[in-house]
Regions:
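GHKL (Bergerat-fold) ATPase N-terminal catalytic module, capturing the glycine-rich phosphate-binding loop
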Residues: 1-166
């Protein structure tokens, strides 16, 4: 009998590639700053709130992502977007000259798992709706769950105030 089969990936592979590869919090933050740089951000900030349950908020003014880009790039591990000539269009660079990309393997975004058990990712590209996704990184610690079985809630909305209602 001859058959063609595909690899299957356990959800914990995301944990192995993300949190487990990050030495410490400064390294995780550095990876996220690289992503902001690649998005032509002029400003990046990190704010830590609370004592009992600290909440970290990282903000940048990069070009952001559309809903489709979030699904097709951010949620695809090892994307080819850093390869070849996938340059950022001039109108999204905010007057900045073309930058060499800092991210190289398409997995730096997974470093956010080293900062806490959950992450709310919110992005917006000019002329498009906001996109938001809540990620519970603990799901990716389950050794029995296949990656394809982890479903993340992703929503789009038009105004920032709408996020508070959701």
């Amino acid at each position: 009998m001859k058959e063609s089969v595909a690899f299957q990936t356990r959800a914990r592979t995301i944990d192995h590639l993300g949190r487990e590869q990050i030495a410490d919090v400064p390294t995780a933050v550095s990876e996220l700053w690289k992503n902001a740089y690649d998005a032509y951000a002029r400003e990046v900030s990190l704010h830590i709130h609370g004592d009992d349950v600290p909440v970290a908020v990282m903000l940048d003014d990069g070009h952001g992502m559309t809903h489709k880009q979030f699904l097709d790039k951010w949620l695809v591990v090892g994307t080819e977007s850093k390869e070849g000539n996938d340059s950022v269009p001039k109108e999204l660079r905010k007057g900045l000259t073309e930058r060499p990309k800092q991210g190289q393997k398409g997995i730096g975004r997974l470093s956010v798992a080293a900062l806490g058990a959950t992450a709310l990712i919110v992005s917006k590209q000019a002329g498009n709706d906001f996109v938001a996704c809540l990620v519970d990184w603990r799901l990716f610690e389950n050794p029995y769950l296949l990656l394809q079985d982890v479903k993340l809630p992703v929503i789009s909305f038009s105004e920032a105030k709408d996020l508070l209602i959701l």
